[in-house]
């Protein structure tokens, strides 16, 4: 069973803005990443009854491991 997840953007003033609803956590995380790449900012995925299940931290920098 796929759940429906809401994607929100955290605004600079601390408020939240609902963006969209998508089906499935994988799709929600993917969409959240695309939104952040296009418009920047902090986003999170919310599942009713569970709360925030994923967040995108704009200050996180991916570092590739060097072998």
Spans of model-derived segments:
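A short, charged, amphipathic alpha-helix used as a generic interaction element across diverse proteins
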Residues: 22-46
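Short, mixed-charge low-complexity intrinsically disordered segments
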Residues: 37-67
């Amino acid at each position: 069973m796929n759940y429906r997840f809401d994607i929100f953007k955290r605004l600079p003033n601390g408020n939240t803005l609902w963006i969209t609803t998508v089906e499935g956590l994988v799709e929600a995380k993917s969409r959240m990443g695309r939104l952040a790449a296009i418009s920047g900012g902090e986003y999170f995925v919310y599942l009713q009854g569970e709360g925030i299940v994923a967040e995108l931290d704009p200050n996180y920098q991916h570092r590739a491991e060097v072998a």
